[in-house]
Amino acid sequence: MPETTTTALDKEQLRELVADVLDLDVAEVTDDADFMEDLDVDSLMALEITVRLEKEYGVRLAEAELTSITSLQGTYELLTSKLGDTR
């Protein structure tokens, strides 16, 4: 899978990425489903999601930012912020 260099973020592609990592149907990954509570994500799966996000979107996620990766919406907002940051 080629590394994405565009700053455009498609929520449905993000949903597919998360569903793929978690081996779930895309429909199960709703915007507000809590990854740990609703989708049974453990720490290893959370790390795998983080690694895939960094590779796919070409961003580095600081440890403090990982608390935002609790739902698709939170992840989307974090990535939108990171991709819009031109520093």
Swiss-Prot record:
Secretion signal, residue range per the UniProt entry: none
Molecular function GO labels: phosphopantetheine binding
GO terms, biological process: antibiotic biosynthetic process; secondary metabolite biosynthetic process
Keywords on record: Phosphopantetheine, Phosphoprotein
Carrier domain segment(s): 8-83
Amino-acid biosynthesis among keywords: no
Post-translational modification summary for this protein: 4'-phosphopantetheine is transferred from CoA to a specific serine of the apo-ACP-like protein.
Database matches in Pfam families: PP-binding
Modified residues (O-(pantetheine 4'-phosphoryl)serine): S43
InterPro entries attached to this UniProt entry: ACP-like_sf, PKS_PP-bd, PP-bd_ACP
Purpose: Acyl carrier protein.
Protein name: Polyketide-8 synthase acyl carrier protein 2
Source taxonomy: Bacteria, Bacillati, Actinomycetota, Actinomycetes, Kitasatosporales
